[in-house]
Structures are given as structure tokens and as C-alpha cells.
Curated annotation (Swiss-Prot):
GO CC field: extracellular space
Tree of life domain: Eukaryota
Species for this entry: Psammomys obesus
Subunit record text: Heterodimer of a B chain and an A chain linked by two disulfide bonds.
Signal peptide limits: 1-24
Keywords: Carbohydrate metabolism, Cleavage on pair of basic residues, Disulfide bond, Glucose metabolism, Hormone, Secreted, Signal
Function: Insulin decreases blood glucose concentration. It increases cell permeability to monosaccharides, amino acids and fatty acids. It accelerates glycolysis, the pentose phosphate cycle, and glycogen synthesis in liver.
Subcellular location(s) per record: Secreted
Propeptide feature: residues: 57-87
GO biological process: cellular response to oxygen-containing compound; glucose homeostasis; glucose metabolic process; positive regulation of protein secretion
Stored Pfam families: Insulin
Taxonomic path: Eukaryota, Metazoa, Chordata, Craniata, Vertebrata
Family membership noted in the UniProt record: Belongs to the insulin family.
Record protein name field: Insulin
Bridged cysteine pairs (disulfide): C31-C96, C43-C109, C95-C100
Amino acid sequence: MALWMRLLPLLAFLILWEPSPAHAFVNQHLCGSHLVEALYLVCGERGFFYTPKFRRGVDDPQMPQLELGGSPGAGDLRALALEVARQKRGIVEQCCTGICSLYQLENYCN
């Protein structure tokens, strides 16, 4: 009985100290099935959307053509292509390559 009385305050402390799920989820790398599970956790019944990237063809009008020669303006096109690539970061680049938070994952919910 004396052991139980000593452990009771410790048990009460552990129960009260348990972090909430929002605090338990820190910014982290999420890849593959871990990323999908995190999206299910964050989005719940709303669900989430995913549009897989397809391989861009040479004539894709959304991707600026790069001039590899030394013609004038080639540097401008390279800078534009790099800027477009930076703006089109997907969830994998954001959460797997980098780290993301619950708030960033919520951007992918329906």
C-alpha cells in the first residue's frame, strides 16, 4: 500500500502532463505512407486532394523553353524557369524533402 501511495502523484502528473496531439506533432519530414497518414489525421472527413505530376513534354506550354546556346536572353529564360519551379513546390517537396507543419498540411485538405 505504501508503494501505491508513492506512485499515485507520479501517475497523476503523467496523466495531466500528456501533450495534446497538436503539440505532439512537431515540424518533421513526412514521406510516403507517413505523409498519407498525416494527411488523413489532419484533414479527417474533409479528405485531401492529390494531383500526381506527369512528365512534362518538350512542347508543354506551361514550362518555359530554355535556350542552351549563348544567345541574348538565355539567362533571363533560365531565371524565369527557376522562378516557376520554385513557385510550383508540391507536398512531397515541401514535406518530404523539407519539413512541414500541421498548418502546411491543412493547405492540401479539400
